[in-house]
Amino acid sequence: TAIRETFTSEKPISVRISATDWAENGITEEDVLYISSVFKSVGVDIINVSTGNTVSNEAPKTGRMWQVPFSDTIKNTAQIPTITAGIITDIDQINTIILNGKADLVALGKPLLLDPYFVRKAQAYENFEVKDIPKSYERGIAPLYSLQQTERKQLEKMKRKLKPKSNKN
């Protein structure tokens, strides 16, 4: 295809689509799956799934991880990797999305504006070793790693205690 003639396979191609316009009689799931399949057939490697901001009469339904279901549908029906976003605010949400195969990448915006150390804290939470961080950060971040690991253990213990008996089996 013309796309791959310009960008060889060493250069990944991503396109961003709006999976819904949130408008009555607007973009349908069928429309989205069709365009996703077309993009895949012409050499697109990954689709950045967004929603809305295309018509003035939209009525979006937002909330935590609100765009993930659209990414999931495209990824698992059109069989093309996806990027998702939409009020994803912590590492547990990211892990849930990736490990459950709902997207291949998670785009973060607002969490990084609120906390520029979000990624470093996530590394600590996930038990990365101090040797995994750049030398220039070591003295400032090393104590954070042990603190985050302790907090994670406490949080996991609390989650287990609060889990309903019906879910413990």
Task: Label every PLM stretch briefly.
Residues T1-N169:
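Flavin-dependent oxidoreductase catalytic cores
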